Swiss-Prot record:
This is Son of sevenless homolog 2. Residues 1079-1099, 1276-1288 have a biased composition (Low complexity). Promotes the exchange of Ras-bound GDP by GTP. The gene is Sos2. InterPro entries: DBL_dom_sf, DH_dom, Histone-fold, PH-like_dom_sf, PH_domain, Ras-like_GEF, Ras-like_Gua-exchang_fac_N, Ras_G-nucl-exch_fac_CS. It comes from Mus musculus (Mouse). Gene3D superfamilies: 6.10.250.3060, Dbl homology (DH) domain, Histone, subunit A, Pleckstrin-homology domain (PH domain)/Phosphotyrosine-binding domain (PTB), Ras guanine-nucleotide exchange factors catalytic domain, Son of sevenless (SoS) protein Chain: S domain 1.
Length: 1333
């Protein structure tokens, strides 16, 4: 006897590299073919590959040498009916006429490898046949798994989904000999528990899923069972068929209509609406009496005559033979499953009555409640008739009655299902083996049955995977030692391993059926009545043949689709029906949205409009992205023209039947024309209206800028006719009317907060004293609050269209980006103002107080989550004119220096800490806008506008999608306002800041730098003495709200920190520990954002700008560029500061309320008494006059503010600056950094050496040429600009304790650390960035 060949080990260590992954790419194509709207993960495809190789082993075990050998092996090993379908598919694959549709699995790769599996070379046609069988089975598995995934409302097929769906399919389980170990237990591991309470949206979403399932059941009745009756017109009379199926076609038509209405309503739901308004869908149909067919069907199906007629019909021998010839088990399915399936519409109608009540209870819209109430009223007569019919015929309707067990209608919560299974298992004594939940997904029914040959009655539990036979424990539960379980296990039957056979009544039993296992053992169970037997047989047969009937329905639907393709107009008449090709549209590889919709990579404008309004599916994300970004490749007028053209769909060319009807003067009503109108025209037109609605709702500024555009849209909307379109047209008209009113009346939505905003804080200046407003006279809390309110308003007004295409840097920026430019200009002005405030404070004591006050404002910014304000201060303190003020920084309190360190760290390492912080806070907040601008610039410049495909330019929509993602992130922080009170005078003060006055950018830059040299000359060991300009106290009011007036800090995210003078050591920002020191500078190659000021050059349109190592340039703003009216350039700076090692410095103690006096700087130990009068100002010429810092309304001057000066050098320079060289044009993406070598002669941290280093030009008027490296000192400060301090009327000077302790010799400047690495310079992010002449 010949020994059977050993199976080939595909995944052994030796063979795995040859086979693993060979089929995965092809299997993905098969999946896309059978379920184009779903995706499959890699793990699932590898699992199917394993199954396919397992199947290949089975086929090769017979040593096939011809196609007939393979066919015989398939017939012997494949379960029925899958063997017939697999053979038919394989035979068609080897026919010559099928060469136009080749197989997807790689035959050419598998054919040579089969020699290794079989041990001999096989003919190519045999390999082709085998591969065709394997492809059919893989498609069948993916089809089954996809249906399961679709039913559970997921969008990706996983390995677990394949296992679960195969577990429920007896045919595939038999084929692959799978273990029944996949059940609900494994599925419930990641599912959160549900409370069972459904809101309105959940109800509608669940109803859509149930209607789709219900529609499939109706298709099963009509297209599988009724078609089986219609196959033999001689055997079944039309009247007999009508008695069985009644008006099921009318029910099907109603269901299709209702499902379409609900889906359209969900798609067209306004974003401002709390939920879809489904009431109108039911109201319209109820008023048309469209639900009346349910009454007729109930009357026919529930009548006793139905069962009598059906039983007589099925008793005919010819009828039994007819159904048996269609498919194995089909006769039993007709006899037992069809009558129960016909009851589904009856019970589904009652489901509608309950659903309407639930929707009404959950609805939040009064109009929707009215519609639902009208629908309930209109259906009251139908409900009464249904109840009357039901009571008249009174079928015993029990909770366990298997009305429809065909489809796996599981409990809505898997947790409830597993709970039910666990309860049953606990109630069975003697249970062994796997838990029920590990091998079953659904509980079907339970009840008593008699086991023929047994003494006692059995209680049966039926699941989709198991049938459990138990013996009741009669009276034993009360006895000690016995189990408390109600049942004792007798037998278990695995459903996929048994056959169900109907038994005719005999002397030994009646109402019986037989379970036959594979080993030919059989068990006969008998019911008490014919009705109970029918219930059990319906459940068992539906479970056993479910997969067969499923496949029959799928094949019918596929055949219909192939035989009746959707007729469309010719491309010459309607250009939106041109076939997809690489010349007009491309999709992202292996990428789909969560809803399974393919993601567009690029396409022509026509193809993008087609997909925007596609007839097969709606893509809300694509609509939002398109309307946000379309202006970069299409004008609004062009878009309107295209959408109107898309809406006006011509009829397809008439068929011969249509031509005959037209000749007779009749309207053509062919089936394919009706299908065209229903499946193409109506969906497309609804989606065009949906795009119009989104356009006017979210992008109305297009219509504000072009009134002709609005007039054309209104004219078109008013011309739209059709009942289905009516409510959508009315919706668009309402939105336009509302927008017009808001535009005319300035209507704004009133915002209500849970708590009232905190009162306004005042310091020295009070309301009505506008002319005295200043950094030092206003309360630091209120300065931060009012600036936060102003910047929040500016941030929230920026529209996505102002960013797409970098339009804020283009010629028409004033028109296209007005709100963005306002924010940029405000940020620039505020940064310059902070810098000016510091530099113009000549008196050392005043200057330290000003810097300290700015740090307090920074703390409040942090508490308010105003990151834009934080980085404005960082930018100001790191400006060239402020950064060099070493003595000022050294006199700052240690705690405040640490606060500044933390703030500077936000901008380091690609803003890593800032991004983490932003994600960790709750709105409201004001994000740093510069990071978005840089990311958009990088995306715009780093990706081409068009994709080249076969010589054609396709719009690169992937690029637009990336930009839209950035704008979407901006928008998510625009919704939450601050609970703060606007103070009108302070608001006007900050809105009209004009620190530059009438000076040009160059003049203002020189002025600030010269002033900086004047107040702290180069190499000075102590600052010069200047008289105080202010007559008021420099003591800070602190940043704790006034507890005397209000004890809470409502209105801010959290209470402000206590005043720094009184609080213990505390840092507002969570920081990296000081022990974490960086030994090297991180040099990011592409910063994420226009950061705060780097040492950068300028360009008209740059965010990060370049600096030539030999040029002199400065920067004072963190934002991208605005062209300035008084100068060519706009400077953007970002201090990329890095923490170096430092020695701890304990500063000399500074008692509260004590101020530095300039006399104290010249003598050791000299202390000035409190009674000493203030120093007399020196008789010397006043500083250069600057325009007063009294705010001036912008008036007609709304241009950007000139840019700041170039940064000062760290080394002495010649008296005259060298000419500034022009930079060659550079691209802003991936520019390498220029690393300047560290200055020579920095051997150690010697204080005298530090003092000897020249920190300013030899001449005050000499601008520096080498930018100073930004080294983090122990206080990283941000440059600010400030006006002259306001002079209030001088009150009598009280005795002041002005005796500043004599300053000892300055300790080593640990705040200015040595460079252990080259300093960092940033390059331009835009092309053609030039250094100013």
């Amino acid at each position: 006897m010949q020994q059977a060949p050993q199976p080939y080990e595909f995944f052994s260590e030796e063979n795995s590299p040859k086979w693993r992954g060979l089929l995965v790419p092809a299997l993905r194509k098969v999946q896309e073919q059978v379920h184009p709207t779903l995706s499959a993960n890699e793990e699932s495809l590898y699992y199917i590959e394993e199954l396919i190789f397992q199947l290949l082993n089975k086929l090769c075990m017979a040593q096939p040498r011809t196609v007939q050998d393979v066919e015989e092996r398939v017939q012997k090993t494949f379960p029925h009916p899958i063997d017939k379908w697999a053979i038919a598919d394989a035979q068609s694959a080897i026919e010559k006429r099928k060469r136009r549709n080749p197989l997807l699995l790689p035959v050419d790769k598998i054919h040579p490898s089969l020699k290794e599996v079989l041990g001999y070379k096989v003919d190519y046609h045999v390999s082709l046949y085998i591969v065709a069988v394997l492809e059919y089975i893989s498609a069948d598995i993916l089809k089954l798994a996809g249906n399961y995934v679709f039913n559970i409302r997921h969008y990706e097929i996983s390995q677990q989904d394949i296992k679960v769906s195969m577990c429920a399919d007896k045919v595939l389980m038999d084929m692959f000999d799978q273990d029944d170990d996949i059940g609900l237990v494994s599925l419930c591991e990641d599912e959160p528990c549900s409370s069972g309470e459904l809101n309105y949206y959940d109800l509608v979403r669940t109803e859509i899923a149930e209607e789709r399932q219900y529609l499939r059941e109706l298709n099963m009745i009509i297209k599988v069972f009724r078609e089986a009756f219609l196959l033999d017109r001689k055997l079944f009379k039309p009247s007999e068929i009508e008695k069985i199926f009644s008006n099921i076609s009318d029910i099907h038509e109603l269901t299709v209509k209702l499902l379409g209405l609900i889906e359209d309503t969900v798609e067209m739901t306004d974003e401002s609406s709390p939920h879809p308004l489904a009431g109108s869908c039911f109201e319209d149909l109820a008023e048309e009496q469209a639900f009346d067919p349910y009454e007729t069907l109930s009357q026919d199906i529930l009548a006793p005559e139905f069962n009598d007629h059906f039983s007589k019909l099925m008793a005919r021998p010819a009828v039994a033979l007819h159904f048996q010839s269609i498919a194995d088990g089909f006769k039993e399915a007709v006899r037992y499953v069809l009558p129960r399936l016909m009851l589904v519409p009856v019970y589904h109608c009652w489901h509608y009555f309950e659903l309407l009540k639930q929707l009404k209870a959950c609805s939040e819209e009064q109009e929707d409640k009215e519609c639902l109430n009208q629908a309930i009223t209109a259906l009251m007569n139908l409900q009464g008739s249904m109840d009357r019919i039901y009571k008249q015929h009174s079928p015993r309707r029990r909770p366990g009655d298997p009305v429809c067990l065909f489809y796996n209608r599981q409990l809505r919560s898997k947790h409830l299902a597993i709970k039910k299974m666990n309860e049953i298992q606990k109630n069975i004594d003697g249970w062994e083996g796997k838990d029920i939940g590990q091998c079953c997904n659904e509980f079907i029914m339970e009840g008593p049955l008699t086991r023929i040959g047994a003494k006692h009655e059995r209680h049966i539990f039926l699941f989709d995977g198991l049938m459990i036979s138990c013996k009741p424990n009669h009276g034993q539960t009360r006895l000690p030692g016995y189990s408390s379980a109600e049942y004792r296990l007798k037998e278990k039957f695995v459903m996929r391993k048994i056959q169900i056979c109907d038994k005719e009544d005999a002397c030994e039993y009646r109402h019986a059926f037989e379970l036959v296992s594979k080993d030919e053992n059989s068990v006969i169970f008998a019911a008490k009545s014919a009705e109970e037997k029918n219930n059990w047989m319906a459940a068992l047969i539906s479970l056993h043949y479910r997969s067969t009937l499923d496949r029959m329905l799928d094949s019918v639907l596929l055949k219909e689709e192939n035989e009746q393709p959707l007729r469309l107009p010719s491309p010459d008449m309607y250009r939106f029906v041109v076939t997809d090709s690489e010349e007009n549209i491309v999709f992202e590889d292996n990428l789909q949205s969560r809803s399974g919709i393919p993601i567009i990579k690029g396409g022509t404008v026509v193809k993008l409009i087609e997909r925007l309004t596609y007839h097969m599916y709606a893509d809300p994300n694509f609509v939002r992205t398109f309307l946000t970004t379309y202006r970069s490749f299409c004008k609004p007028q062009e878009l309107l023209n295209l959408l109107i053209e898309r809406f006006e769909i011509p009829e397809p060319e008439p068929t011969e039947a249509d031509k005959l009807a037209l000749e007779k003067g009749e309207q053509p009503i062919s089936a394919d024309l009706k299908r065209f109108r229903k499946e193409y025209v109506q969906p497309v037109q609804l989606r065009v209206l949906n795009v119009f609605r989104h356009w006017v709702e979210h992008h109305y500024y297009d219509f504000e800028r072009d009134l002709e555009l609005l007039e054309r849209l209104e004219s078109f909307i008013s011309s739209v006719r059709g009942k289905a379109m009516k409510k959508w047209v009315e919706s668009i008209a309402k939105i336009i009317k509302r927008k017009k009113q808001a535009q005319a009346n300035g209507i704004s939505h009133n915002i209500t907060f849970e708590s009232s905003p905190p009162p306004v804080e005042w310091h020295i200046s009070r309301t009505g004293q506008f002319e005295t407003f200043d950094l030092m006279t206003l309360h630091p809390i209120e300065i931060a609050r009012q600036l936060t309110l102003l910047e929040s308003d500016l941030y929230r007004k920026v529209q996505p269209s102002e960013l797409v295409g970098s339009v804020w840097t283009k010629e028409d920026k004033e028109i296209n980006s007005p709100n963005l430019l306002k924010m940029i200009r405000h940020t620039t002005n505020l940064t310059l103002w902070f810098e000016k405030c510091i530099v113009e404070a000549e008196n050392f004591e005043e200057r330290v107080a000003v810097l300290s006050r700015i740090v307090e404002i920074l703390q409040v910014f942090q508490d308010l989550n105003n990151f834009n304000g934080v980085l404005e201060i960082v930018s100001a303190v790191n400006s060239v004119s402020v950064y060099r003020l070493d003595h000022t920084f050294e006199a700052l309190q240690e705690r405040k220096r640490r606060i500044l360190d933390d703030a500077v760290e936000l901008s380091q390492d690609h803003f890593k800490k800032y991004l983490v912080k932003l994600k960790s806070i709750n709105p409201p907040c004001v994000p740093f806008f510069g990071i978005y601008l840089t990311n958009i610039l990088k995306t715009e410049e780093g990706n081409s506008d068009f994709l080249k495909r076969k010589g054609k330019d396709l719009i690169n929509f992937s690029k637009r999608r990336k930009v839209a993602e950035i704008t979407g992130e901006i928008q998510q922080y625009q919704n939450q306002p601050y609970c703060l009170r606007t103070e009108p005078e302070m608001r006007r003060f900050f809105e009209n800041l004009n620190p530059m006055g009438i000076l040009s950018e160059k003049e203002f830059t020189d002025y600030l730098f010269n002033k900086s040299l004047e107040i702290e000359p180069r190499n000075c060991k102590q600052p010069p003495r200047f008289p105080r300009k202010s007559t008021f106290s420099l003591k800070s009011p602190g940043i704790r709200p006034n507890a005397g007036r209000h004890g809470s800090t409502s209105g801010t995210l959290r209470g402000h920190p206590t005043p720094l003078e009184r609080e213990p050591y505390k840092i507002s920002f969570s920081r990296i520990a000081e022990t974490e020191l960086e030994s090297t500078v991180s040099a990011p190659t592409s910063p994420n954002t226009p950061s705060t000021p780097p040492v950068s050059a300028s360009s008209d349109h740059s965010v990060f700008l370049d600096v030539d190592l030999n040029s002199s340039c400065g920067s004072n703003t963190i934002f991208a560029p605005v062209l300035l009216p008084h100068s060519k350039t706009f400077f953007s700076s970002c201090g990329s500061l890095h923490k170096l090692s430092e020695e701890p410095l304990i500063p000399p103690p500074l008692p509260p309320r004590k101020k530095f006096d300039h006399d104290a700087l010249n003598s050791k130990g000299a202390v000035k008494s409190d009674d000493d009068p203030p120093a007399i100002p020196p008789r010397q010429p006043p500083p250069p006059k600057v325009k007063p810092r009294v705010p001036v309304l912008m008036g007609t001057f709304d241009g950007p503010v000139p840019s700041p000066p170039p940064p000062p050098p760290r080394d002495p320079l010649p008296d005259t600056p060298p000419p500034v060289p022009l930079r060659p044009p550079e691209h802003f993406i991936n520019c390498p950094f220029n690393l300047q070598p560290p200055p020579l002669g920095h051997p150690h941290r010697d204080p005298d050496w530090l003092r000897d280093v020249s920190t300013c030009p030899n001449s005050p008027s000499t601008p520096p040429t080498t930018p100073s490296p930004r080294i983090p000192r122990s206080c990283h400060l941000l440059s600010s600009s400030h006006s002259s301090l306001a002079h209030l009327p001088a009150p009598p000077v009280p005795p002041r304790q002005n005796s500043s302790p004599l300053l000892p010799k300055l300790p080593p400047k640990t705040y200015k650390r040595e460079l252990s690495h080259p300093p960092l310079y940033r390059l331009p992010l835009l092309e053609n960035a030039e250094t100013p002449q």
